């Protein structure tokens, strides 16, 4: 990536969302134009990703590829607890897991 615009070209979503009664639970991120403070008991996701669309000016062999790796994080009094810490994230482990389908 060569410019800030490249980031939005391949990363057209936020970095996460609330988790609760639903996978994409409701809740505001801003209160009075300030980012909401995390409080113990809240659960959020951290999910960077990249998506390569067909209209991008890159080699066609990469068109249609999308990858997003998500962690689910519980906010605690002491900081946080990554609920998904045992989820497979290494590329070799992911490829092995997908080959078993």
Task: Give the predicted meaning of each segment.
Residues 1, 5-12:
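Internal maturation/activation junctions in enzymes
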